[in-house]
Curated annotation (Swiss-Prot):
Keyword Secreted: yes
Comment field (misc): Anantin has been tested for antimicrobial activity against a broad variety of bacteria and fungi, but no antibiotic activity has been found.
Predominant localisation class: secreted
Described function: Competitive antagonist of atrial natriuretic peptide NPR-A receptors. It binds competitively to atrial natriuretic peptide (ANP) receptors from bovine adrenal cortex and inhibits the ANP-induced intracellular cGMP accumulation in bovine aorta smooth muscle cells. Can also reduce the increase in cGMP produced by ANP or BNP (brain natriuretic peptide) in pregnant guinea pig myometrium, but has no effect on relaxation induced by either peptide. Blocks the ANP-induced human sperm acrosome reaction without affecting the acrosomal exocytosis or sperm motility.
Compartments in which it is found: Secreted
Covalent crosslink: Isoaspartyl glycine isopeptide (Gly-Asn): G1-N8
Name recorded for this polypeptide: Anantin
Keywords: Isopeptide bond, Secreted
Organism: Streptomyces coerulescens
Any one cellular-component term (Gene Ontology): extracellular region
Length: 17
C-alpha cells in the first residue's frame, strides 16, 4: 500500500495501516 514504512519495488510505501 501507500502508507507505511519502507519502499516496495514500485517505489511506493508498503505496509498499509
Amino acid at each position: 500500500g501507500f502508507i507505511g514504512w519502507g519502499n516496495n519495488i514500485f517505489g511506493h510505501y508498503s505496509g498499509d495501516f
